[in-house]
Amino acid sequence: MLENRVKTKQIFIGGVAIGGDAPISTQSMTFSKTADIESTKNQIDRLKLAGADLVRVAVSNEKDALALKELKKVSPLPLIADIHFHYKFALIAAQSVDAIRINPGNIGSKDKIKAVVDACKEKNIPIRIGVNAGSLEKQFDQKYGPTPKGMVESALYNAKLLEDLDFTDFKISLKASDVMRTIEAYRMLRPLVIYPFHLGVTEAGNLFSSSIKSAMALGGLLMEGIGDTMRVSITGELENEIKVARAILRHSGRLKEGINWISCPTCGRIEANLVDMASKVEKRLSHIKTPLDISVMGCVVNALGEAKHADMAIAFGNRSGLIIKEGKVIHKLAEKDLFETFVIEVENLAKEREKSLKD
């Protein structure tokens, strides 16, 4: 685990700590109409099962705002209300939810922001100042355009507004739709404030596009010690946002959990359908949370070398294959018996490791 993380002020969203020494949390956003409590609850349940720590819901009208009271009662995750344009919806939402997200570029005047702050103070809930490059306040957009400098100036201006109202329980996000502006904005602001950062690339595209952008931007920032909570925005299935976010946390050294998959890119030596087999193995073992390095190889040439560094490896040969545990061959089996035996061995190893950690 990396030890270079920037220490920030800690806030709480429900029972989830954000900032300080707290683990970096993941979140997503439901796409149902929030007033449809059954559908929204179903999506929150899916996110909980996928490993999300927090959930955000859109509050587009008064009906959505009023539904939050009942939704909060059934939500298994802390609830963040996402408010644009209509500050009065934030006043209603603050009575029920665990946090409020506002976009200072469209929420309105200082008086409206003060009203939101007062409501959050009363309920002791935090705010996210959500700055987006595409919707900066007029004074910053005209002076700087949708640039990192413009985003940072907006964030500083709004942080000062909240501080002047004697309110410091907030986090900040600086989102653009491309990697470089996102990284530069967060880097620029980090030494200027003590508040926790919510990381994200906004409107990042489909699964492929978003995974690349988010891995580069968020992974890069995380490895620099920047970031306290995050969302990977994907045009697609909710669960993928959490799956990709947790993978980024693992591979940037911020989360020690789950399997690190090692598999070869295939070549003329492979003697099995490695693409299907690697996918099948990963799906079958996706429930494992124990940190393990697992190797799936299409021939013994690569496998014997890679297996020296893997906790468990499988190597396919001509209608047969090897299972290798911690560098030693423990099974040579016919192809038809390889898969199930390998799954059992990995699950047993995970149990052994968990037991040793508890002991």
Curated annotation (Swiss-Prot):
SUPFAM superfamilies: Enolase C-terminal domain-like, Nitrite and sulphite reductase 4Fe-4S domain-like
Protein name (Swiss-Prot/TrEMBL): 4-hydroxy-3-methylbut-2-en-1-yl diphosphate synthase (flavodoxin)
InterPro entries in the record: Dihydropteroate_synth-like_sf, Enolase-like_C_sf, IspG_bac, IspG_bac-typ, NO2/SO3_Rdtase_4Fe4S_sf
Known role: Converts 2C-methyl-D-erythritol 2,4-cyclodiphosphate (ME-2,4cPP) into 1-hydroxy-2-methyl-2-(E)-butenyl 4-diphosphate.
EC number annotated for this UniProt entry: 1.17.7.3
Signal peptide: none
Cofactor binding: number and manner: Binds 1 [4Fe-4S] cluster.
Cofactor(s) listed in the protein's UniProt record: [4Fe-4S] cluster
A Pfam short name: GcpE
Protein residues bound to [4Fe-4S] cluster: C264, C267, C299, E306
GO BP terms: isopentenyl diphosphate biosynthetic process, methylerythritol 4-phosphate pathway; terpenoid biosynthetic process
Family: Belongs to the IspG family.
Catalysis performed (reactions): (2E)-4-hydroxy-3-methylbut-2-enyl diphosphate + oxidized [flavodoxin] + H2O + 2 H(+) = 2-C-methyl-D-erythritol 2,4-cyclic diphosphate + reduced [flavodoxin]
Pathway: Isoprenoid biosynthesis; isopentenyl diphosphate biosynthesis via DXP pathway; isopentenyl diphosphate from 1-deoxy-D-xylulose 5-phosphate: step 5/6
Key words of the record: 4Fe-4S, Iron, Iron-sulfur, Isoprene biosynthesis, Metal-binding, Oxidoreductase
GO molecular function: 4 iron, 4 sulfur cluster binding; 4-hydroxy-3-methylbut-2-en-1-yl diphosphate synthase activity (ferredoxin); 4-hydroxy-3-methylbut-2-enyl-diphosphate synthase activity (flavodoxin); iron ion binding
